[in-house]
């Protein structure tokens, strides 16, 4: 079981809700993935008009909703989105995203740390999306974040774990769950993230943009479970020289 703040999850695969061709495809893919935590952008919510046709089915399915501040460019905008999500959804959980550059969507470390500090003081369960920066992740942990979400590679790029050397350091040092977020483009990459010791992964584009999102959701569920079990079992050490699996003894020297 994975524990974040006051909540426990059996599944270590978290999913997003964007980029799916239809709302029904998204709901079916989330169900197939067995994900128990789903993130959605606050800016997509419109409870007054009921135009958001994904919210009620997600709530009815029993998954935990993690609103995110995607689109926020600074502390002020992120705080506004977080306050709005708490009012609209009745949750103090927030995925903190601040990326002022609309082209590459790189998270702003300075604004993110300040917003995280304020939100933690206000009683939020903060899960910040950040660069794979071990120093920044430690600072976020120190201000009270419930988990850290370092990127594998740029959002939606499907480039995999380009930041692997830094992810290893973060995983080694962190005292809160580490959720690899962004850039995971294939089930094999999710497996590898879990083999490194990540506590969970968040996947959206790789599922939503696949030819069959429902089947891909199922594949990612299996991949994450496989990676986690491999990590628990203990991977063999990597060596630069060969080692006999059946040592040669005696009879070849006769």
UniProtKB/Swiss-Prot annotation:
Gene Ontology terms, MF aspect: thiazole synthase activity
Record key words, sorted: Cytoplasm, Schiff base, Thiamine biosynthesis, Transferase
UniProt pathway: Cofactor biosynthesis; thiamine diphosphate biosynthesis
Cross-referenced Pfam families: ThiG (PF05690)
Active site: 95 (schiff-base intermediate with dxp)
Chain sites annotated for binding 1-deoxy-D-xylulose 5-phosphate: 156, 182-183, 204-205
Superkingdom: Bacteria
Sequence intervals crossing the membrane: none
Catalysed reactions, semicolon-separated: [ThiS sulfur-carrier protein]-C-terminal-Gly-aminoethanethioate + 2-iminoacetate + 1-deoxy-D-xylulose 5-phosphate = [ThiS sulfur-carrier protein]-C-terminal Gly-Gly + 2-[(2R,5Z)-2-carboxy-4-methylthiazol-5(2H)-ylidene]ethyl phosphate + 2 H2O + H(+)
EC numbers for this chain: 2.8.1.10
Keyword Transferase on entry: yes
Keyword Transferase included in the entry's annotation: yes
Any one GO BP annotation for this protein: thiamine diphosphate biosynthetic process
GO cellular component terms, semicolon-separated: cytoplasm
Compartment annotation: Cytoplasm
Coiled coil: none
Assigned protein family: Belongs to the ThiG family.
Subunit annotation: Homotetramer. Forms heterodimers with either ThiH or ThiS.
PANTHER family: THIAZOLE SYNTHASE
Role played: Catalyzes the rearrangement of 1-deoxy-D-xylulose 5-phosphate (DXP) to produce the thiazole phosphate moiety of thiamine. Sulfur is provided by the thiocarboxylate moiety of the carrier protein ThiS. In vitro, sulfur can be provided by H(2)S.
HAMAP family in UniProt: ThiG
Protein name in the entry: Thiazole synthase
Gene: thiG
């Amino acid at each position: 079981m994975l524990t974040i703040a006051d909540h426990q999850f059996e599944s270590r695969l978290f999913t997003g809700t964007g980029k799916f061709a239809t709302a029904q495809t998204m709901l079916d893919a989330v169900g197939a993935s067995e994900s128990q935590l789903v993130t959605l952008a606050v800016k997509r919510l419109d409870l007054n008009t009921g135009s958001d046709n994904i919210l009620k089915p997600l709530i009815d399915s029993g998954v935990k909703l993690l609103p995110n501040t995607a689109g926020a460019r600074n502390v002020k905008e992120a705080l506004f989105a977080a306050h709005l999500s708490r009012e609209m959804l009745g949750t103090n959980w927030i995925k903190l995203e601040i990326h002022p550059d609309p082209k590459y969507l790189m998270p702003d470390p300075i604004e993110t740390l300040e917003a995280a500090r304020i939100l933690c003081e206000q009683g939020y369960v903060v899960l910040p999306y950040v660069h794979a920066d071990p120093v920044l992740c430690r600072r976020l942990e120190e201000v009270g974040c419930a988990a850290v979400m370092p990127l594998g590679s740029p959002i939606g790029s499907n480039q995999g774990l380009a930041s692997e050397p830094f992810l290893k350091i973060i995983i080694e040092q962190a005292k809160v769950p580490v959720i690899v977020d962004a850039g995971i483009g294939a089930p094999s990459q999710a497996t590898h993230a879990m083999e490194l010791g990540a506590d969970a992964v968040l996947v959206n584009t790789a599922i939503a943009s696949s030819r069959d999102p429902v089947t891909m959701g199922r594949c990612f569920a299996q991949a994450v479970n496989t990676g986690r079990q491999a990590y628990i079992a203990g991977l063999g050490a990597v060596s630069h020289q060969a080692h006999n699996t059946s040592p040669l003894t005696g009879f070849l020297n006769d």
